[in-house]
Amino acid sequence: KNSLLINETGIDSNSTFRRKTSKSDEPFKIIWIGKFDFRKQLPIAIKSITAMNQRNVELHICGTGNDDAVNEMKRMAEICGIASKCHWHGNVSHDKILKMMASSDLMFFTSIMEATSTVVLEAITVGLPILCFNTCGFGPIVKDFAGITVELSNPYKSVQDFAHELSLLYQNRAVLNDISTRMLEKRQELTWEAKAKKLVRHYEEILKK
């Protein structure tokens, strides 16, 4: 039987936030958003930044967990030698998140269990390229036009794969700008209005049979 996939979240077509142009002589600003829990896999992000071994990198971490989880993540950053590259923002308001996205070069989304995360659609709204796993509801969207994906494997290989992609993007910011342009051109396909029209169209086609 044929199946129809329509992701369960949409983008805000009225948003005025737009991502900045990436420049090679500026810090490589990466934003990570989520809870400090197993699903979100912040340790993979921290270890990937460590493995890419580039000096002019900033990892902006938006989100939090219980005291033990926060202390553990900060301790991991120190042990990995990237504490100075990590900026811990805690819980951030929606408007501030959009502003931070607009001033970032890349969203690093390390979640391994998710539907179509709202922050992925918000990044697309802003035109912020995404680096993530090719899994769950968000993977196919990112792989299609919104960024770069790596295959879900094991923690060690994931860190190596992400670090490889991060290094390539760090060295060639024009790739990020090209992805951003493509995102803004195609994002209308993911608005709530477009999804509603698509759903109605398919219902009408079914009723005609």
Stretches found by the model and what they are:
Residues 22-40, 46-49, 60:
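Conserved donor-binding/catalytic core segment of Leloir-type glycosyltransferases
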Residues 1-18, 25:
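Donor nucleotide-sugar binding/catalytic pocket of nucleotide-sugar-dependent glycosyltransferases
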Residues 91-92, 99-104:
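Short alpha-helical donor nucleotide-sugar binding micro-motif in glycosyltransferases
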Residues 129-132:
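Short hydrophobic beta-strand element within catalytic cores of glycosyltransferases
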Residues 72-92:
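Nucleotide-activated donor-binding/catalytic signature segment of Leloir-type glycosyltransferases, i.e.
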Residues 112:
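Aromatic "clamp/platform" in nucleotide-sugar-dependent glycosyltransferases that forms part
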Residues 33, 58-73, 90:
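Glycosyltransferase donor-sugar binding loop
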